[in-house]
């Protein structure tokens, strides 16, 4: 029998602020994707999750349509920590209304 641990998902204060900046239906899309994608095997690359190269923001990215969820995984404590949430317009990433470079 295969036992797959379930990770709890935590949001930083900044990430909660980023989430609040989106419209209600956008928040629902983002939260539904987080619930579906991150509690199980959150550190396994998939079509929507990827390990990022070294950057000051986070280790992992979850792509949800034009939205990006940046997170870190703590495998010892079974925690996924959401660091930032933004959206992409063409090749430009915006987090908290500011353009970001990764």
Spans of features found by a protein language model:
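Arg/Lys-rich, positively charged N-terminal/basic patches that mediate binding to nucleic acids
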Residues: 1-33
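Enriched for short, Lys/Arg-rich terminal
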Residues: 1-6, 28, 64-68, 72-102
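Residues at the C-termini of beta-strands that transition into short coil/loop
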Residues: 13, 55, 86
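Active-site micro-motifs of SAM-dependent methyltransferase domains
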Residues: 17, 36, 40, 87-90
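A short, surface-exposed loop/turn module that caps and links secondary-structure elements
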Residues: 36-61
């Amino acid at each position: 029998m295969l036992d797959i641990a379930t990770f709890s998902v935590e949001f930083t204060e900044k990430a909660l602020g980023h989430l609040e900046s989106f419209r209600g239906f956008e928040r629902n899309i983002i939260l539904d994707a987080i619930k579906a994608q991150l509690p199980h095997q959150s550190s396994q690359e998939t079509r929507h999750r990827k390990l990022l190269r070294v950057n000051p923001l986070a280790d992992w990215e979850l792509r949800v349509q034009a939205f990006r969820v940046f997170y870190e995984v703590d495998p010892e404590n079974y925690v996924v920590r959401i660091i930032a949430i933004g959206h992409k317009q063409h090749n430009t990433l915006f987090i908290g209304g500011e353009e970001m470079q990764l």
